[in-house]
């Protein structure tokens, strides 16, 4: 048998094996061309056979590449990385073997095994569950961590190719646009029709793509107008397409550059979306429309996080308001096609996706780009996509769209409405555009939703009602906070909001966070920096939607400790049926008892100030809080947060029997716990972190205060904290009585505050890095009370040294400047000369 015959036989064996894996004939392409993106010249290469997971073929859907190695040795296999297939099969006719290689993003492919034909066939049979089109496509698509990564797939391959293609295409189109503008202005004095120019560029790209994919038609003709007319006939036969730039010379110039430019056979439609965001949207339009286009990876992350497959096939209807260039619709189209059963024709797939997908967009050019992107993603089918032109907030069509959609995907504008917009549209209820569209979606809740929202959604008071509504409707939620580099042309810090599970019996609340340094890795792998999942039953108190990373780490580190509500009873103060001012006196009166009315006048750390007198009668009260044991020792704390910053709560011991108004909490020990320690727990950084990171309104809710962990302390350590608190109280009282001692007492009280905090922190025994993160929340934040406070550590102090150690005399004495002071200065000429000689 000749070498050529052996090669043909090996190719046939490989083709049959791939078909057995599930790659139908339309997913197998022979003599397939692709551009080598690893070389500056970007030459076109070919492989005898390539297998794809779905149409249209591209580096994003490529699963296997087959290469012929005629001389028996690998010959620059690196070029095949640009195909995008994670596995490369090499045919070696000289020794009648077949090689299997893992394609690397940055280096030469790695040989995994070299097999005889029969062994190769057996290997395909064994690995069918992992190597079928659906599994490989799933592995290549960014998603939440789930099943183990396929052992032959380099997760950096597709991002590397995306970056290379985007860079080359962006450079080409910027040059084309610049040349066209220059040529136009050389011939005309009137203003250039930019929409017509951009429309021309997109049509020529479509022609280039059709030609490079060898679709029947005059796509490679050198005459620009003939090609433009062919694109119009192919895609817009049933409707009138918008006009392109009227200058024939400029049209021809653009086509000459694009026709001979980067080969687009293996291009993915996501790259065209990238071109829209980076090349074809001018800064003015981006600003006016508040455009922060959804990156492809984020759209796919959201879409692949939603269980489309749980819906009946004919009910997977998707609606994308503010569709822009339709990133969610493109991602959803890919997902829908992958869920269709085998045997569905290309025409049936097209008709199905047209029925399932809908969008709405106010910007005419963005809408046109969206249709182009969908057309190209559904290559080579014509137009017909259901994207409406209109203002989402003013269109009467919105309600109908929302009622008809089972899945809503949205990246809305983050800005606020103008006064003019609100004046002409009385249906607007929220000042912010993102909050308003979420409100409207939740009025007609879909089975599933995926939103890109401002970070403020996680805990901002303006979103509290929407968070509560979302929690009521959906049992499965994910809030994934991203850094301010997620959008290319915006520094907004977004959160991905993903929700489904309308009738589940168990609640799952997932909170995740991606740091700026980890964001590139997240785009590659889908793995966040920090991930936390909570579970509860619907009968339980619903856990909050968002748990900040620091709070999660702090609660995990202290989960072995008792909570405050296990060692103390917490109750809100007395509330009157009429305004409290009617029942307050500054002087003692019959029927009145000493008490506290306003936090700002009556409470500072560890001290209650001059009390007022409250009238206490059953008939005046709204509740029975006046019957609580106010006469017993307790700690008093504010019931509403103190500041908008991290300091949320303060407290003071009380043995004088003060009755507190509803603006306070009373905290009574139910075990042998000193009230000074209760106050120190509430005043300290851990208590303020637990409360401050959970507050969604002005109130320090009783259940949140009760969740503060109680430090584990010996009797001696407890007595030490009590003594420090009493010393602080004594110094503060001396300070109030004698203003001349302000400086000395200020320093003494500052030192004592830090020592109390350090002693309480020691009882939590937090990892040093975590303790430092907790304390860093308060850096530069004024502390409630009379003591000037700028933080626990100097601004330039980086080590994670526990506060107690940092304040200790041993640590201070070991500081560098003190060490230098203890060393004697060596001023010996002989020693100096010797050191100079050694250096």
PLM regions: where:
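C-terminal substrate-recognition regions of SAM-dependent nucleic acid methyltransferases
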Residues: 156-197, 201-204, 213-215, 495-643, ...
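Class I S-adenosyl-L-methionine
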Residues: 146-355, 360-369, 391, 396, ...
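Proline-centric
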Residues: 306-309, 319, 441, 503, ...
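Non-catalytic DNA-recognition/assembly elements of restriction-modification systems
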Residues: 536-584, 591-597, 601, 712-839
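Short, basic/polar, glycine-containing "phosphate-handling" surface segments that engage DNA
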Residues: 2-207, 253-273, 473, 720-723, ...
